[in-house]
Curated annotation (Swiss-Prot):
Single biological process term from Gene Ontology: peptidoglycan biosynthetic process
Gene, per the UniProt record: murC
Recorded GO MF terms: ATP binding; UDP-N-acetylmuramate-L-alanine ligase activity
EC category name: ligase
Chain residues that bind ATP: 114-120
Organism: Bartonella tribocorum (strain CIP 105476 / IBS 506)
Name this protein carries in UniProt: UDP-N-acetylmuramate--L-alanine ligase
Keyword Cell wall biogenesis/degradation (UniProt): yes
Parts forming coiled coils: none
Cited InterPro entries: Mur-like_cat_sf (IPR036565), Mur_ligase_C (IPR004101), Mur_ligase_C_dom_sf (IPR036615), Mur_ligase_cen (IPR013221), Mur_ligase_N (IPR000713), MurCDEF_pg_biosynth (IPR050061), UDP-N-AcMur_Ala_ligase_MurC (IPR005758)
Record-listed E.C. numbers: 6.3.2.8
GO cellular component: cytoplasm
């Protein structure tokens, strides 16, 4: 049974969140009555309002109004006044992933999972299915530049979603095709152990029906190990690995662009197909790997090589994924969501490969628990930056953990051998340091999942103000 349109008003607690806003927008576009609340004003909240969705700021019981269904995410505490009011009114309380699964049930669905790279890969799959005229529904964990939003309500049979593993609810998603980009020791506050993370991803793949398939990156040892344990589902492997079914090779870089080839080898038919001189308007081998996952799916769905090439070349990227925010005196400034050591390392490697000058990393640690679990990894992930500036920790509601703060991280990075790492406190410190020692052709890269994106967007304007007139060069 499909969820009836006359189910009543659906209320989203935390509707401005990147995961919730896309689901709310698609339900609204499909004709359902949608409203919600969030703690603060944001670009997502404003976008939803422009579409006609009523959004309250602040969480109060009266915000529910005449709601008949209440949707919440793991971030919503059970002490939330709206959650309590919904319980008292005996309204259905639905987890975010269950609502996403409801959208997927009556479509052919692709779920993109993995510890890192999900958002970019989801966007790339969407771009190639767009190019192939599939007109998909898309719900992503980041703003897709081509759409100006994190969702798309297409009329086609296919749906592409980002599968968030952070709270384990991605196992509820009914996917016909499952992608796993990588598996790392992340979200241990939920899983408790790395073995539990491994088990969850195995279940994610094994949930694929017999007529579907999994797309697994065998450049990552954990994913290659997972591929070896799947014996009752069709698996397509990808990566730079010479044994991959869909392999990328012959990379060449031109600033922020990458050229490469892809070799597709079918284990079913033995047939080989080469896609030559593909252009990806992004830097970084990790992004080429993400693109290769999308190519594997597009090829399997019968999209022509020409349309794959076109879709890839026209890919507009994702907000906060190595996004250029501006420049000043030839210094290029970028914003990236990377907050895990693996992500930080990949972004800085891409910056190093692209920059003609030095790389200056400005990192905002995200959550004390992540620092605690991955302290040694954080100490070793900044090697491709000439200078590292560490900001105060963005706590995301957590209490500090003694011995695992920003000052301790700075000392730990120094002890691991980095030659120039410093503690900073605010944007004023960044303006002062960058204006004094950065030079033309240097890259300044902001990293973090917290509010550091505001610094990244503000810095070009602040620096241009030092000249007494606006020399800001926007993207």
């Amino acid at each position: 049974m499909k969820m009836p349109l006359d189910i009543g008003v659906i209320h989203f607690i935390g509707i401005g969140g990147i995961g919730m806003s896309g689901i709310a927008e698609v339900f609204y576009n499909l004709g359902y009555k949608v409203q919600g609340s969030d703690q603060v004003e944001s670009a997502n909240v404003e976008r939803l309002r422009r579409k006609g969705i009523n959004v309250h700021i602040g969480h109060y019981a009266e915000n529910l109004g005449n709601a008949e269904v209440v949707v919440f995410s793991t971030a919503v505490k059970k002490t939330n006044p709206e959650y309590i009011a919904a319980k008292e009114r005996h309204l259905p309380l639905v987890r975010r992933a269950e609502m996403l699964a409801e959208l997927m049930r009556f479509r052919r669905a692709i779920a993109v999972g993995g510890t890192h790279g999900k958002t970019t890969t989801t966007s790339m799959v969407a771009a190639l299915l767009d190019a192939g005229h599939f007109d998909p529904v898309v719900i992503n964990g980041g703003i897709i530049n081509a759409y100006g939003t994190n969702s798309r309500t297409g009329e086609g049979d296919w749906m592409i979603v980002e599968a968030d593993e952070s709270d384990g609810t991605f196992l509820k998603l009914p996917a016909d095709i499952a992608v796993v980009t990588n598996i790392d020791a992340e979200h241990l506050d939920h899983y408790g152990s790395f073995d539990a993370v491994r088990t969850a991803f195995r279940q994610f793949v094994e949930n694929v029906p017999f007529y579907g398939f999994a797309v697994l990156c065998v450049d990552h040892p954990e994913v290659q190990s997972l591929a070896g344990r799947i014996d009752d589902r069709w698996v397509i492997t990808y990566g730079a690995n010479p044994q991959a079914d869909v392999r990328f090779l012959n990379l060449s870089r031109d600033g922020q662009k990458t050229h490469f080839d892809v070799l597709v080898r079918s284990r079913k038919t033995g047939r080989k197909i080469e896609l030559k001189n593909l252009l990806l308007p992004m830097a970084g081998q990790h992004n080429v790997a993400n693109a290769t996952a999308a190519i594997a799916i597009a090829h399997e769905l019968g999209i022509s090589n020409e349309l794959i090439k076109k879709g890839l070349a026209e890919f507009g990227g994702v907000k906060r994924r190595f996004t250029r925010t501006g420049s000043w005196r030839g210094i290029e400034i970028f914003d990236d969501y990377g907050h895990h050591p693996v992500e930080i390392k990949a972004v800085l490697r891409a910056a190093r490969e692209s920059a003609k000058g030095r790389v200056i990393a400005i990192a905002q640690p995200h959550r004390y628990s992540r620092l605690y679990h991955l302290f040694d990894d954080f100490a070793a992930c900044f090697n491709d930056a000439d200078t590292v500036l560490i900001t105060p920790v963005y706590a995301a509601g957590e209490e500090p953990i003694v011995g695992f703060g920003s000052q301790e991280l700075v000392e730990h990075i120094k002890m691991a051998g980095h030659r120039d790492v410093r503690l900073i406190h605010d944007l004023e410190d960044v303006v002062s340091l960058v204006s004094k020692f950065a030079q033309a052709e240097d890259y300044v890269v902001f990293l973090g999942a917290g509010n550091i994106t505001q610094w990244a967007c503000a810095l070009p304007h602040r620096l241009s103000g030092l000249d007494g007139y606006d020399k800001f060069s926007a993207h």
